[in-house]
Amino acid sequence: MKLTALHFYKYSEPFKSQIVTPKVTLTHRDCLFIELIDDKGNAYFGECNAFQTDWYDHETIASVKHVIEQWFEDNRNKSFETYEAALKLVDSLENTPAARATIVMALYQMFHVLPSFSVAYGATASGLSNKQLESLKATKPTRIKLKWTPQIMHQIRVLRELDFHFQLVIDANESLDRQDFTQLQLLAREQVLYIEEPFKDISMLDEVADGTIPPIALDEKATSLLDIINLIELYNVKVVVLKPFRLGGIDKVQTAIDTLKSHGAKVVIGGMYEYGLSRYFTAMLARKGDYPGDVTPAGYYFEQDVVAHSGILKEGRLEFRPPLVDITQLQPY
């Protein structure tokens, strides 16, 4: 098998409700897709999770495109016959995990039969608009992740009025400081499953007495398996959010899941406001998580998607089928 051609595509859809995070407000999701063609004419797609700007991570759509262009020129027409051999082709991309993850998503499909399956539904609420509340009422997720705002306690009270049981998670995106210690201590009374990344400087955890704030989860700092193990051994970290784009791809996450469980850590698979192709693989990995991952039903964030019926809500779970990318919706890039 050889790779003979590479095509780039752009796709953008408005969010049904703008995404309000501690770092940025998003109105649209711009996304890069790649299409790898093999010597038999088969096409395999990868969806990049990087954003247009570096608000979340230093890798952006433009930087990933540049890296993949160069990678393809270095590997065009090289022969490989196994998944393991294909992964050797991306050894040079260890320092650009978002680019590596995009390629690995396509390579994985060359050597694996993609299954149909179902997973628990884990919603993310950002800003808690009336439209989001109505969506939560209608879909009844197993887990709700609430993005931190100064109104966090009020928003939790609003969520507690919903007429179904759910696990509550808070995501702070490294935005808190010492002045937020009191709020964090109040959260400990709210049966919060865990809080993702409260502090930019993780050493601030040394200033907090054990048990006085919710359990801490790594997310932004979960950049490599070695770094993760070091942090869970140094600090009282119980949960790790694993994201393929941050670790370097599906294979890296699969290895990390097994290793971290052997260290006694709980694992969650994180999403990236994805379209249907990437959402399928996030859901596939989330089957091995200890808590519901960031997996939402088709139509939760966007009216349109390049993969139809990616995550159909049925009896409280999301059903996934092998994804088929509608290339007619993609714009050459």
From Swiss-Prot:
- List the catalysed reactions: (1R,6R)-6-hydroxy-2-succinyl-cyclohexa-2,4-diene-1-carboxylate = 2-succinylbenzoate + H2O
Keywords, ordered alphabetically: Lyase, Magnesium, Menaquinone biosynthesis, Metal-binding
Known pathway? Quinol/quinone metabolism; 1,4-dihydroxy-2-naphthoate biosynthesis; 1,4-dihydroxy-2-naphthoate from chorismate: step 4/7; Quinol/quinone metabolism; menaquinone biosynthesis
Q: Does the keyword Metal-binding apply?
A: yes
Q: Which cofactor does it need?
A: a divalent metal cation
Active site: residue positions: 147 (proton donor), 243 (proton acceptor)
Gene Ontology biological-process entries: menaquinone biosynthetic process
Task: Quote the EC number.
Answer: 4.2.1.113
Binding site residues for Mg(2+): 171, 196, 219
- Domain of life (superkingdom): Bacteria
Q: Which InterPro entries match?
A: Enolase-like_C_sf, Enolase-like_N, Enolase_C-like, MenC, OSBS/NAAAR
Gene3D superfamilies, per the entry: Enolase-like C-terminal domain (3.20.20.120), Enolase-like, N-terminal domain (3.30.390.10)
* Pfam families in alphabetical order: MR_MLE_C
* Top EC class, one word: lyase
Q: Which GO terms describe its molecular function?
A: magnesium ion binding; O-succinylbenzoate synthase activity
Q: Which family does it belong to?
A: Belongs to the mandelate racemase/muconate lactonizing enzyme family. MenC type 2 subfamily.
Oligomeric and partner information: Monomer.
Q: What does this protein do?
A: Converts 2-succinyl-6-hydroxy-2,4-cyclohexadiene-1-carboxylate (SHCHC) to 2-succinylbenzoate (OSB). Does not show N-succinylamino acid racemase (NSAR) activity with N-succinyl-L-phenylglycine as substrate.
In terms of PANTHER family, this protein maps to:
O-SUCCINYLBENZOATE SYNTHASE, O-SUCCINYLBENZOATE SYNTHASE-RELATED
Q: What is this protein called?
A: o-succinylbenzoate synthase
